[in-house]
Amino acid sequence: MIPLILLSCLIQTIPLFSQGFSLAFGSCLHQEKELSLLSKAKAQSPNAFVFLGDNIYADTYDSMQINAAYQSLACNPNFQALKRSVSLYATWDDHDYGMDDVGKYYPLKEASKRMFTSFFQPPNRTQLLSHQGIYQSYLFRCRGKKIQLILLDTRTFRSSLKRINKPSEETDSYYPYERLYLPVYTEDSSMLGEGQWAWLAKQLRVKSAVTIIASSTQFATEYNGYETWANFPNEQERMRNLIYAVQKEHVVFISGDVHYAELSKDCTSEYPLYDLTSSGISESWGFAAPNVHREDGPVMENNFGVLRIRPWRNELTFLIYTEKGLRLQRTIYLNELEFK
């Protein structure tokens, strides 16, 4: 049974009555850095905060080093302040799962899961420990409307990537950098694994005013030679087809990983699928990869994201904040996210 978290709009300390439901999120934070952006996120008074992965940088085959990285994050004053003020939810990406770009063959994935659940203490921890992976789902309520949060696990079951062994033979003027991977088209390749796909199909049948799908890696971008859902085109299409098959409306994605922020819009589905990427809280990158689906951005400074939902106004707003304040804002109407 999905835990139902009730956020009453009548409680003055929760800013739902005038502002609706507010979900803050971010990714890519190094445990040894100041993480001052977490204090900025706290100042937005969100109803929940989602860590989208690379919540620590472990990069190891030693479980003691993973644990030490979590302990370092636990001692960070800005993390402590955020934890005291708002409910935290989390999934993982590669650097906190274990190693850069790894998938289902990472040998410490079960030990890593135990440390993840011990650190974040997810509300459904008992249920989470009963199956492989760390995928989770939650329901929040505001003004009689349910808002669903689905946290995917894009590491535990992900097939191996197809590495470009000779980059010089794969040069292309469209990519002003050295690509690492090619798309994988084999039928048995997977991002989520069959068990998680079956679970996701059930979650998408749960009635909700808005469904937020959290993926550590970007969903709505084109292939760019780095890690994205587009490395597994069949899986990307499977997601679109599943949303259509269950006739799930009002779905949006949030993602991290890439060390910059942007809003993407995938118009190849039956209705536009938006993906608000926020990365990183402390980590940065020198450039943004090509993305024909980019609607806004990129924001190259350290950042965090916010989804602000006002169901009674039929509105959803995408926001990106940096140390200097608001950098990206886009409001859409929920009826844009409906089958025609």
Place the predicted regions along the sequence by residue.
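Metal-dependent phosphoester/phosphodiester hydrolase catalytic core
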Residues: F17-K340
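Bacterial Sec-dependent N-terminal signal peptides
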Residues: M1-Q19, I243
